[in-house]
């Protein structure tokens, strides 16, 4: 069995080498104090049955050091979303129904929201997002100014978890970030064409010039289409990590919601990662199974060194935790038991593949969307 021990050691070592390459380029926001004596921007929040989440976002907006307008686009909510939003002083606008079925996801609400914005700068923020610091919006504006107040800026919020099951989102969140290509030196450095969806900042002129969310009207995950629309007009598209300014808490409704959400995400958003980066990601993830396999076999066969296999497992686990700490706050127990996370990721991946290629339909928040129509 010594030969198997050597093979597994080589596999895990190669896996960790790939892990060192998939997220070795950082894109972090830089804080700076700005002075505004007028409304700095309009924040547009698409919301459908978000009464349990939107209050946290609106409270964090009130705490910001710069004055902003807030528009909540109420997309057919059947709960108290509108009442909660008004209690924080937000303007609530009901989304006009899409009777023709031409729009998917939140793009319809976002596009209508721009017509109500009174500032040139506009930001689209998901209802489950929270600004962690009082200078968060200020920092976003500063970063946008650094790119000449042109194009599109997007942020992937830091993922905060409170209940154990929420930690099963760990690998998905890391893949969302590294799958954007630009966080790896394996990227060829060409113009970025993709954007994160939870937080985006742009200006009206560029928004309408590119078609804005109209270019993503058939997309459930709108970030890729939005980024491509801006790139096609030779406008800059930038992506940033949220910590320590922006965070979100996902799928508070329960484990079923988490499964449905990531199935939707993988069904519609897994095609933008470049092949060599995707290969490195797959090889890195495979190290999770290889390391636990070596550990289990060493406990059964004396020819394999338990000490070496434990060291191998702990080495991979250390890197696994290190990379995930950049994108979120997850259960230490789940981080150590990463093979469970890998198996869950694989299960959802297979499920999303079936929905995409066999059924062609994905369901989210009580609505069904045909993936086959999505371009």
UniProtKB/Swiss-Prot annotation:
Q: Which CDD domains match?
A: Glyco_tranf_GTA_type
Sorted alphabetically, the Gene Ontology cellular component annotations on this record are: plasma membrane
Indicate how the chain sits in the lipid bilayer.
Multi-pass membrane protein
Enumerate the InterPro entries for this protein.
Answer: Glyco_trans_2-like (IPR001173), Nucleotide-diphossugar_trans (IPR029044)
The primary site where this protein sits is: membrane
Keywords, in A-Z order: Carotenoid biosynthesis, Cell membrane, Glycosyltransferase, Membrane, Transferase, Transmembrane, Transmembrane helix
Q: Where does the record place it?
A: Cell membrane
One of the entry's Gene Ontology molecular-function terms is: glycosyltransferase activity
Is Lyase a UniProt keyword of this protein?
A: no
Pathway given for this chain reads: Carotenoid biosynthesis; staphyloxanthin biosynthesis; staphyloxanthin from farnesyl diphosphate: step 4/5
Q: Which residues cross the membrane?
A: 3-23, 164-184, 277-297, 330-350
Key word Transferase present: yes
EC numbers listed for it are 2.4.1.-
List the GO biological process terms.
carotenoid biosynthetic process; protein N-linked glycosylation
Q: Which domain of life is it from?
A: Bacteria
Tell me the protein family, please. Belongs to the glycosyltransferase 2 family. CrtQ subfamily.
Q: What does this protein do?
A: Catalyzes the glycosylation of 4,4'-diaponeurosporenoate, i.e. the esterification of glucose at the C1'' position with the carboxyl group of 4,4'-diaponeurosporenic acid, to form glycosyl-4,4'-diaponeurosporenoate. This is a step in the biosynthesis of staphyloxanthin, an orange pigment present in most staphylococci strains.
Q: What is this protein called?
A: 4,4'-diaponeurosporenoate glycosyltransferase
The protein's organism comes out as Staphylococcus aureus (strain NCTC 8325 / PS 47)
Higher taxonomy: Bacteria, Bacillati, Bacillota, Bacilli, Bacillales
The protein's gene is named crtQ
């Amino acid at each position: 069995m010594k030969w198997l021990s050597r093979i597994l050691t080589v596999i895990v070592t190669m896996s960790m080498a790939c892990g060192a390459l998939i997220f070795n380029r950082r894109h972090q926001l830089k804080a700076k104090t700005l002075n505004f004596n007028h409304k700095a921007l309009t924040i547009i929040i698409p919301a459908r049955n978000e009464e349990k989440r939107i209050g946290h976002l609106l409270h964090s907006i009130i705490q910001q050091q710069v004055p902003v307008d807030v528009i909540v686009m109420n997309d057919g909510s059947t709960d108290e979303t509108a009442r909660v939003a008004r209690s924080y002083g937000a303007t609530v606008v009901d989304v006009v129904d899409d009777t023709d079925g031409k729009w998917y996801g939140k793009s319809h609400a976002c596009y209508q929201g721009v017509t109500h914005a009174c500032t040139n700068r506009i930001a689209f923020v998901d209802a489950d997002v929270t600004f962690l610091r009082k200078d968060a919006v200020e920092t976003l504006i500063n970063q946008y100014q650094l790119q000449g107040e042109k194009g599109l800026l997007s942020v992937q919020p830091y993922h905060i978890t409170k209940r154990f099951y929420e930690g099963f989102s760990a690998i998905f969140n890391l893949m969302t970030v590294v799958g954007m290509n630009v966080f790896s030196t394996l990227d060829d450095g060409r113009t970025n064409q993709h954007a994160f969806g939870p937080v985006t900042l742009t200006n009206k002129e560029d928004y309408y010039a590119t078609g804005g969310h109209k270019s993503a009207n058939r997309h459930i995950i709108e970030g890729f289409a939005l980024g491509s629309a801006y790139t096609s007009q030779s406008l800059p598209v930038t992506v940033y990590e949220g910590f320590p300014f922006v965070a979100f808490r996902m799928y508070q409704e329960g484990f079923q919601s988490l499964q449905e959400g990531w199935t939707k995400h993988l069904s519609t958003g897994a095609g933008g990662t470049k092949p060599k980066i995707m290969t490195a990601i797959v090889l890195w993830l495979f190290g999770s199974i290889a390391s636990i396999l070596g550990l289990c076999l060493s406990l059964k066969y004396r020819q394999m060194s338990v000490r070496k296999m434990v060291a191998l497992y702990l080495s991979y686990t250390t890197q696994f935790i290190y990379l995930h700490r950049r994108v979120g706050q997850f259960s230490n127990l789940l981080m150590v038991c990463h093979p469970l996370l890998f198996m869950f990721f694989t299960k959802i991946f297979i499920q999303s593949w079936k929905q995409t290629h066999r059924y062609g339909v994905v369901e989210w928040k009580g609505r069904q969307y045909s993936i086959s129509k999505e371009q």
